[in-house]
Amino acid sequence: MEKVILGRTGLEVTKLALGGLFLSELGGAFEDSKHATLKALELGINYIDTAPAYYDSEKVLGKILQEWEGPLVISTKLGGRPQPFDPQSKKALIQSVEMSLEYLHRDSIDILMIHEPDRVREYNWWTDELNYEGPVLEAIDEMKKAGMIKFSGLGGTTAHELARVCDSGKFDVVLTAYNYSLLWREAQYEIFQAAKRHHMGVVCGSPLQQGALAVRYDDAINHGAPWISEPRREQFRALYRLLDETGMGIVEMAIRFVISNPSVDCVLTGSSN
């Protein structure tokens, strides 16, 4: 399994990594999550991402990892816990990481990301939205000094605003989801450049666009799905023609496309079908 250095962290991670959203109860039975996770680790994957907002993903992952003794990089996030969640409470943020450490059975978190730092209506992280200042930065600094976390990051879903937070230069890694894939490429215009300016590691989530690129939808594209615009339909048709010409499956092509971009260090794939 090919490995890269994740930006300025110096961490060596596999280009292909495991996303933890559907390790949770959303993904089905525990045994299925366990099988998928341990199989991924046995095949060489050494990086898994999770979050408190992913239901019971941290607890499930922690339980699974009791059966794994190999090296592993884990990222988790701040956001959504404890309830009622107050992103302006440094005490609550530190408490959330203490819970993550307990659930994951870890002494420290390799990468702690701020979840949705680019969506103020989701989580009001900042007291100064122009310079990206707030108690969350104080909490991160304290936890680094205490050895609770090693590196900090951003996990977001916008393209323009997330790039602006990257340009603050205050974070080591950026995880962008839904913004870079075969047919959605907004991240390449701003996020990748901002990350490069600050030597950040770049992680791309959902290369299959949460299912849009997991299987072919020929009938829907050609005869149904009235909510899809004609330009988008033509994109899908062109993609399907390319698949026919190359004989490659859509999942393989989708992951190969993202992972081959030199601006991308690591690609997260889900654990469920």
Where are these regions (language model features)?
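Beta/alpha (TIM)-barrel catalytic core signal, keyed to glycine-rich beta->alpha loops juxtaposed to Asp/Glu
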Residues: 3, 117-273
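N-terminal binding-site loop/beta-alpha segment at the start of enzyme catalytic domains
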Residues: 1-76
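Short amphipathic alpha-helices and their capping/turn segments at secondary-structure boundaries
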Residues: 1-9, 61-67, 93-104, 189-200
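Structural motif corresponding to the early beta-alpha repeats
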Residues: 67, 71-91, 114-118
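Active-site groove signature of glycoside hydrolases
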Residues: 101-125
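Conserved, mostly hydrophobic/aromatic
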Residues: 6, 18, 40, 48, ...
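Short, acidic/polar
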Residues: 27-40, 86-105, 157-164, 254
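Active-site mouth loops of central-metabolism enzymes
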Residues: 19-31, 78-94, 123-129
